[in-house]
């Protein structure tokens, strides 16, 4: 009688679920799922200089693109974040700046005084100088944080976002006010 109960338990616990699980996949193709092709585009970005309109000082100055990206990352994202998040921000910031350098996207209201980008976060990307960024951090952490930002930018040097062989327009908003804007208006 004990053997009978053991046999029934094995059938109930193992065999029946096996048929149920097998029947759930019965009509599915065994073809592998085809994933979209992914690629990382690394370019030798030229020109390497970007013209920046400083909204505070109302001056235009030229700087190295990678130095500009460091200052954007410092302004846009807390340095305490993980290095991979900082790298993603660096790629997005570089792509945004690069598209503006190429005049790839319309919509400039000449708020830049002839420059590629401005430092007004309400119009372009937030930007702070290295000195300003370091003054916002605790003194003993400032060098570590700046080094982390430099590493994120250096490890992604030349990498931009593309979609269907075109440089992407990586716009975003930091505050939606409870609703999002129509994409046509961005």
What are these regions (language model features)?
Residues 1-186:
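Conserved, single-site charged/polar hotspot
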């Amino acid at each position: 009688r004990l053997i009978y109960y053991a046999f029934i338990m094995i059938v109930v616990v193992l065999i029946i679920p096996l048929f149920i699980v097998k029947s759930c996949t019965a009509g599915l193709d065994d073809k592998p799922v085809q994933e979209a092709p992914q690629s990382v585009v690394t370019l030798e970005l030229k020109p390497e200089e970007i013209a920046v309109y400083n909204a505070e000082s109302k001056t235009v100055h030229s700087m190295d693109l990678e130095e500009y990206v460091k200052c954007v990352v410092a302004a846009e994202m807390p340095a305490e974040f993980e290095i991979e998040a900082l790298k993603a921000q660096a790629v997005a910031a570089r792509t945004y700046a690069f598209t503006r350098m190429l005049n790839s996207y319309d919509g400039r209201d000449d708020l830049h005084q002839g420059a590629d980008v401005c430092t007004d976060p309400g119009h372009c990307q937030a930007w702070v100088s290295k000195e300003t960024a370091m003054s916002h951090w605790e003194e003993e952490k400032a060098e570590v944080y700046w080094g982390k930002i430099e590493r994120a930018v250096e490890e992604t040097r030349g990498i931009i976002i593309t979609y269907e062989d075109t440089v992407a327009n990586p716009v975003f908003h930091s505050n939606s006010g409870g609703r999002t804007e129509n994409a046509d208006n961005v």
